[in-house]
UniProtKB/Swiss-Prot annotation:
It comes from Saccharomyces cerevisiae (strain ATCC 204508 / S288c) (Baker's yeast). Residues 1-23, 88-107, 258-279, 347-376 are annotated as: Disordered. Coiled coil: none annotated. It comes from the Eukaryota. Keywords: Activator, Cytoplasm, Mitochondrion, Nucleus, Transcription, Transcription regulation. This is Respiration factor 1. InterPro entries: Rsf1_fungi (IPR027998). GO terms for cellular component: mitochondrion; nucleus. Mitochondrial and nuclear transcriptional activator required for respiratory growth. Induction: During respiratory growth. Residues 354-376 have a biased composition (Low complexity). It is found in: Cytoplasm; Nucleus; Mitochondrion. One of its GO terms (biological process) is aerobic respiration.
Length: 376
């Protein structure tokens, strides 16, 4: 191999084994790479690379094999130049395309996002059972505390009937549809989510009516809205108690109700009963006579029972027995009926006389006083 030495002015020939020149690459042979640069190597270190001079490797076949790496862009950081070319050290930033750097950073960020998403998926899968159980427990607590809104007259007369089919809970601001499907025997219980209470009160009627129309295909009226409840549910029975006067007062016309109150007030002023129209004094006397008659009938029944069981009438003088009679209105005073009361019914006298004779014969000792007592 011959080398030209400009200082010696002659050719020098070196002998020996062939040297490995793979590390020595003429940078001018690279595609689209500028061979000539102005300035000294020290100045070029501070010069920004021109975009037009950035090497663009379109085909990897143009790059020598020893510079190629699998799945990576070629690295020119170790390349050197020969003596004929300018002694420029090619850095990694100068040789590596900008698009490759951006693509690598984009891939890294994409992989980071994918790793985060996978972590979230793994966490959800591992804790799905716990989350689902907590959600179910919270929903069951809500269902236990549901309350139907108490109807008001403006709800019956206005366009707010749909609000009456949605129950509320103190645990959340959301509401739950209580429409009862008679075919499936199930309550809807669909949750209506609200941002706050103001939006619920402001837009509740329209949203509820839209749900009832689209999902259940029903139109509510003051006469049929109670038909869409489950009448056997405690929730309905607590709010719509027909034994109370809730629904009856709501459905009665205000004018008719006012007339009834006025009529009742007028009857009280005149001293007449509002229903019968009779005098209140006569009505009280009639009630007293009815109570006395009921007491007399009950006392006769009690006497017949005592005679059938051979129980002496002296048991009626027993104070607990007397209290029991007063409690159940069999007698109205502390004094029991006298003998005249028993003598008024001859059947009672005869039964009592037979009962006394039976008691005397069983005891073996005559009671002349009792026999004389029942002898006329």
């Amino acid at each position: 191999m011959k080398d030209l030495n400009p200082e010696m002015g002659k050719f020098a020939t070196t002998k020996g084994p062939p040297q490995d020149n793979r590390g020595m690459v003429d940078i001018a042979t690279l595609p689209n790479f500028p061979a000539n640069r102005s300035g000294t190597p020290r100045e070029e270190m501070y010069l920004a690379p021109n975009k037009m001079e950035t090497p663009r490797i379109l085909n990897m076949n143009m790059v020598p094999d020893y510079l190629q790496k699998e799945n990576f862009s070629p690295d020119f950081s170790s390349a050197t130049v020969s003596a004929k070319s300018s002694p420029v050290n090619v850095t990694h930033d100068e040789s590596l395309p900008l698009g490759t750097i951006e693509s690598n950073s984009t891939k890294d960020s994409k992989y980071a996002v994918q790793r985060q998403q996978q972590q979230v998926v793994d966490f959800i899968e591992n804790n799905m059972q716990l989350l689902s159980s907590e959600t179910l427990n919270f929903r069951s607590d809500i269902m236990k505390t549901l309350e139907l809104p108490i109807p008001k007259r403006r709800d019956i007369k206005g366009n707010h009937l749909s609000k009456l089919l949605f129950a509320k809970s103190p645990l959340t601001i959301n509401t739950y549809c209580q429409f009862y499907d008679r075919r499936t025997k199930r309550i809807c219980n669909q949750e209506m989510i609200w941002k706050d209470k103001n939006s619920r009160e402001k837009h509740g009627s329209r949203k509820y009516q839209r749900h009832l129309s689209k999902v259940h295909d029903v139109q509510l009226t003051p006469n049929n809205f109670t038909e869409f409840f489950d009448h056997n549910s405690p929730l309905f029975q607590e709010c719509y108690d027909y034994q109370s006067r809730l629904m009856r007062d709501l459905l009665v016309e205000p004018d008719a109700k006012f007339k009834e109150k006025k009529k009742k007030k007028k009857g009280d002023v005149n001293g007449n009963h509002p229903e019968t129209g009779s005098s209140l004094i006569n009505h009280q006397v009639q009630q007293q006579n009815v109570r006395e008659l009921q007491s007399k009938i009950a006392m006769n029944d009690l006497i017949e029972i005592l005679i059938d069981l051979n129980i002496p009438f002296s048991v009626l003088d027993y104070q607990p027995m007397r209290n029991w009679l007063i409690k159940y209105s069999i007698i109205s005073t502390d004094t029991l009926p006298d003998e005249v009361y028993f003598k008024t019914d001859p059947g009672v006298n005869e039964l009592e006389h037979n009962s006394s004779n039976l008691n005397n014969s069983n005891s073996g000792t005559p009671h002349n006083h009792n026999q004389n007592q029942h002898t006329n």
